Amino acid sequence: MVSPVVLATTAMIVVFLLAQRYLSLPVLPNEPLLIPHWMPFFGHAFRFARSKRSFFRWANAKTGGQPFSVPMGGRRHYIFSDPADIAGIHKNGKTLSIRGFVRFIYISIWGFKPADADAMWEIKPEWHRMDIEWLLSDKNDQIAVQYLRRIEEQLRALDAEVEGAPDKAIVRPGLKTVVDVQGKATCQVLYGATTLEKHPGLLDDLTIMVRDGFWGLLFRAPRFLFRNAYEARDRIINTYADLVENIETRKDVSQYLYERTVYLTQQGISPQAQGADMLRTMFASLLNSMPTGYLALLHILAEPGLADEVRKELIDCGYLERSPEEMLEILPGKMPLLRSIWHETLRMHNNSLTVREVTADTKFMGKTKWQVQKGGVINIPCGLMHFNEALHPDPESFHARRFMDKELGGEGESHARTTKPFGGGSTHCPGRVFAEKQMIGLVAALLMRYDMGIVNADWKMPLVSEFDDITKQPTVWIRISKRV
């Protein structure tokens, strides 16, 4: 007689095989190569969740660097990384849409109600125009000048800490130092110093929300499982809702946010929904630039002599003689080494993912002709492009001068076509220009003001700049003293 265990196991295998057969889409001509998985519905989801960077690089190696597709979460995910293919995807925005992904993120991460997320999407053309006007045009200089002034204020507070130490030197966590200086300066510029005074734990709440609950929020896990993250998000949203309700009396808020708030209020967007939207803009303005600034600083301190070379570049372009208003005459245009370090740090550590939903069977021309099926999801992981040896020789190593012109002593690579840390197409991040000024402004100010060195000999460079990951890495301690 056959054992019940054997029968049950056999039945389970049969069910799995039937589900695999009938739930899987056929592979069409000109469709990226499918990497199958024995598990129905979930597919490669668990491997992806452990480390999307490792997963994409494993699959990419398995297919010889060609586009591929994987079953994951009940859908077929198409992965592209060649610049020509990416350009073809961005040209087909009607059937390769970001709408569903944006709605999902608005509700899951930022805490929008579904109706509010839909209302924001309907009026996106106008508020996105404001974003572009203030963040991509010359108007962003107004924000950048105020940011540089606020950086100076934060560094004066750090000066006092250094001067009060017995040997005129302090040892601080590197990431926390960047968050304190850059994070506070950015929040004061955009949302007003009053907002930070009323909620001094704003940046700590952002850290708690992302570090302790990003994935729980993303997949809408029960609140009791990620209570700290949910409560931190609530406090941030309520803080910004209070700002919206009192916008006419908050004279220190940026003109950019003021105009945006007035428009959204006129369109009937509630203070609570606008609070969620300000959380979104806070997230966007800090959670790429802060980790990148931190990692750029670590690379500079880790490479012998590089800090002094950066300081020489700054002195040569007249950094010491300039006020914040005058600084933008040289920042970042006259700082090719720092700009190259910025782009190289983004190349090595940015782990962002551009996502498009396939809303109709679509054929598009990239490096070759491709076909993708309705219901699928296109993923563009920038890391695959960033570590493509054909685009970036010796991709596993940090090259400070990789993106400097050859006539300046650099390697002459162009970041514009071969790196995608800020997405592309219609959703190309409008804050990318200000983000560069944020990072370079911060790192330049720190290096010119302080002697800095990494204290712990066993430290390791974090692999990725995602804030939820980098906050969980072992602390890198930095010794800080005033330069003579």
From Swiss-Prot:
PROSITE patterns membership: CYTOCHROME_P450 (PS00086)
Main location: membrane
Any single GO BP term: mycotoxin biosynthetic process
Pathway terms, separated by semicolons: Secondary metabolite biosynthesis
Entry annotated with the keyword Cell wall biogenesis/degradation: no
Pfam families per the UniProt record, alphabetical: p450 (PF00067)
Entry superkingdom: Eukaryota
Membrane topology: Single-pass membrane protein
Annotated localization: Membrane
SUPFAM superfamilies for this protein: Cytochrome P450
GO cellular component terms given for this protein: membrane
Descriptive protein name: Cytochrome P450 monooxygenase poxD
Taxonomic lineage from the root: Eukaryota, Fungi, Dikarya, Ascomycota, Pezizomycotina
Name of the gene encoding the protein in the UniProt record: poxD
